A protein has these predicted regions:
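Surface-exposed, charge/polar-rich loops and edge strands
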Residues: 2-27, 34-192
Length: 192
């Protein structure tokens, strides 16, 4: 039950953070799910196409660009596109002076995903070594997820939808404990 309360508090904190006005990235403590505003220099030449499904389960790419903000390098996840939009100039139209987004810590690479094909710019994970090999730069552990009403690429919606199975776990363990207690009482009564 303690972990359930901890998880509910964590979800509440994330929801609260996502509804607050954005803060200046340079003048704030970096933390997960922080809404930020910033400006920087986007590198369209080293754009990364990360294979992913959209909200409807359709395959495509998330467009990720290196962005330099006051000498610090970040990855900017601009959103999802269909396969046919890859390398289209139409997707390189972001105003570099008014970026609003959400900071999120980079997930660890899944060992079951295929290797990135850096030469064809076809990515399955944002493996830090591969990203360095491709861009020649080291990046913050936080990714900026673009926020806004853009059509192409369509920004990924970041919300507090994190796994919370603690109620199920508690119910399972309490049910198991009660079952064992009832079996114990049944056999104890039978033997006396």
């Amino acid at each position: 039950m303690i972990r359930l309360n901890w998880k509910l508090n964590l979800i509440s904190e994330i929801e609260s953070s996502l509804t607050k006005p954005p803060v200046d990235l340079l003048n704030s403590e970096k933390k997960n799910f922080l809404r930020i505003k910033t400006s920087g220099e986007i590198d369209y030449d080293k754009q990364i196409y990360l294979y992913n499904l959209n909200e409807d389960g359709k395959p495509g790419f998330e467009v990720i660009n290196p962005i330099t903000i006051n000498t610090k390098n970040y990855l900017l996840n601009r959103g999802w596109i269909t396969f046919d939009k890859k390398n289209s100039l139409e997707i390189n139209n972001l105003d570099e002076q008014n970026i609003i987004g959400v900071l999120k810590k980079q997930n660890k690479a899944n060992i079951f995903k295929p290797k990135n094909d850096i030469e064809k710019n076809y990515w399955f994970t944002l493996n830090r070594d591969d990203v360095f090999s491709y861009t020649g730069k080291n990046f913050s552990e936080y990714i900026i997820y673009l926020d806004g009403n853009y059509q192409t690429p369509k920004p990924k919606k970041i919300d507090a939808n994190i796994s919370n199975n603690h109620k199920k776990y508690a119910l399972t363990w309490f049910s198991l404990a009660i079952s064992i207690l009832l079996l114990y009482l049944y056999f104890r009564k039978k033997n006396y």
